[in-house]
């Protein structure tokens, strides 16, 4: 039984019903429908912390999905899982791939900035101020991109940029 048919959460059930209706009425190919089903199941598994299952669904969705915009969100979600697992280098790769297909994803820029900022903090703890400045500068560049795309979001990042003289 597909994951989408065994959701217990009301919001998930509602989303699934609406998505199923849309898939029936909007003219799409069978391949697009399958890709969306895997994507939806991946989101459901991800929201429940079932990251291995989510990744399997996302990889299957990537195999089927041909639209670059839709692929960008699949790649972004794969990046989120790697971020959650502490696999920052992999996460950055997936965020980059998502942005190659859709440069208007402020959340990808934000997450890349957060990873770079974290690495800057780690460099400070390891006594490497040069590396920390490099990481912080990179974080600043990503946050500037995120803020450019979504000016009313990322207030804390905006404040950090001002406080550190990077804005």
UniProtKB/Swiss-Prot annotation:
HAMAP family linked to this entry: Ycf3 (MF_00439)
Task of the protein: Essential for the assembly of the photosystem I (PSI) complex. May act as a chaperone-like factor to guide the assembly of the PSI subunits.
An individual GO BP term: photosynthesis
Membrane topology: Peripheral membrane protein
Entry coiled-coil feature ranges: none
SUPFAM superfamilies documented for this protein: TPR-like (SSF48452)
Protein name in the entry: Photosystem I assembly protein Ycf3
Family: Belongs to the Ycf3 family.
Residues in TPR repeats: 35-68, 72-105, 120-153
Subcellular locations according to the entry: Plastid, Chloroplast thylakoid membrane
Source organism per UniProt: Marchantia polymorpha (Common liverwort)
Stored PANTHER family: CELLULOSE SYNTHASE OPERON PROTEIN C (PTHR44943), TPR REPEAT-CONTAINING PROTEIN MJ0263 (PTHR44943:SF8)
Superkingdom of origin: Eukaryota
